[in-house]
């Protein structure tokens, strides 16, 4: 029988895709959040939480699909990196 575990995992391609997705998502989240922070900081925090809460169930379902799991990894790393960058930018302005 051909089991899914017998297939080789394309680490190089998958990590390249995840890195690209992470970069695009991180830039998008930082740029949009910086615009929202100018309006009101709580608006930026609230909309980030709503966006992540809405995306999380979909991404959680995709995490076991062979191709889509790399997008999930990239999205998670991108959002986490963007939040850390926003935190550093916000605390650095103080």
Curated annotation (Swiss-Prot):
Pfam families: DUF2537
Cellular compartments annotated: Cell membrane
Topology in the lipid bilayer: Multi-pass membrane protein
Signal peptide start and end residues: 1-26
Key word Transmembrane present: yes
The protein's name: Uncharacterized protein Mb0906
Keywords: Cell membrane, Membrane, Signal, Transmembrane, Transmembrane helix
Chain segments annotated as transmembrane: 42-62, 71-91
Chief localization: membrane
């Amino acid at each position: 029988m051909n089991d899914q575990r017998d297939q080789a995992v394309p680490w190089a391609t998958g990590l390249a895709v995840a890195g690209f997705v992470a970069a695009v998502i991180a830039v998008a989240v930082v740029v949009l959040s910086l615009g929202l922070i100018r309006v009101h900081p709580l608006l930026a925090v609230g909309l980030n939480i709503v966006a992540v809460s809405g995306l999380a169930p979909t991404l959680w379902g995709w995490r076991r699909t062979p191709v889509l799991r790399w997008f999930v990894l990239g999205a998670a790393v991108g959002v986490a990196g963007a939040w850390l960058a926003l935190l550093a930018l916000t605390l650095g302005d103080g």
